[in-house]
Amino acid sequence: MSDRKIINDPVFGFINIPKGLLYDIVCHPLLQRLTRIKQLGLSSAVYPGAQHTRFQHSLGAFHLMSETIKHITAKGNFIFDSEAEAVQAAILLHDIGHGPFSHVLENTLAGGVSHEEISLMLMERMNKDMKGQLNLAIQIFKDEYPKKFLHQLVSGQLDMDRLDYLRRDSFYTGVSEGNIGSARIIKMLDVKDDHLVVESKGIYSIENFLMSRRLMYWQVYLHKTSVASEKMLVNTLTRAKELALRGVELFASPALRFFLYHPIDKKEFYNSPDCLENFIQLDDNDIWTALKVWSNHSDVVLSTLSRGMINRKLFKVEVTSSSITKARKEEILSRISKQLNINKKEAEYFLSISSIENNMYKKEDDSIEIIYKDGSTRDIAKASDMLNISLLSRKVKKYYICYLRSENDGH
């Protein structure tokens, strides 16, 4: 019998998963749940090819981790088999706490608990079932293990998570800017004093990686239409929750019903086992099915928003460098309340104002150290002659004003 499973991945080709702990994790219901959650949430409203799942991403990140371990050990860095297995387990599980449309759900139904916190709760739960086999993986995930570079490979400036999602999201969206040379970057990685370093000849690959990341953020992750559909979904779920707490009957799967009909805050999410039980039953299907049914609900606000999501009649978006004036806000709200024959308070569900800040490189987060032939190291910000790190480190702030289109306003 074969000692491994081989999975064919469109981005990296054949991925080998050894039988035993790692294959058990891949087959675990909590990881299989990620096959029903899209990696890019609502980005398919802009890039129809972006249908890939968080499960595919987890496998890709695992594959890159396996390659990295090979290259790092080939350079004379000693890694125990138990450490290699643990860091591979940690990367397989790094996204296990994501819900459907992750950030939307965190902010509307899950009481503000982040997916990282939920990932850890689920890892600890799996560890009990697996009789402590994930102890080391959890230590690495929490950055409590002495070999710091192992944590950096799971969560850092050059982690396997980023190296996979930039390549994968680029592949499925068709936005070629994200197509980084992950294989070359991995070949250039080394370890010094238990921290990750990059050989100086890999400097151009790192520059390309940082630029790609910035381009992908503005072109894909923060694309104005994706932001608009996300805001629309936030408002739809917020309205549904408001109606539910007023006792209005709404169609929902049992797991979604739990979150709609219970006011949940962070404390309760941590203390009530029901919260986690219901959370792991949720995936994209719960949300889409509810939206389809809500499209015909008697509440005008809920049905209009739900139809907008289902039929891609999304909010109109304006991106500006300064916030909206009070007068402009009033003008939009009164137009919407007339258009839908609803009051001003209800009209607020059809207007969303937010600002987004992004800087691609925060030195304090986790700098990228370049190592030279003589063993000395310098931060990429100082080592790079081509890359304007001061530009990449600068905060870019944009204001997004999303609102219901007027009736005579097409797409």
Listing of model-derived features with the role each one plays in the protein:
Residues 87-92:
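Short alpha-helical catalytic segment bearing the HExxH-like zincin motif
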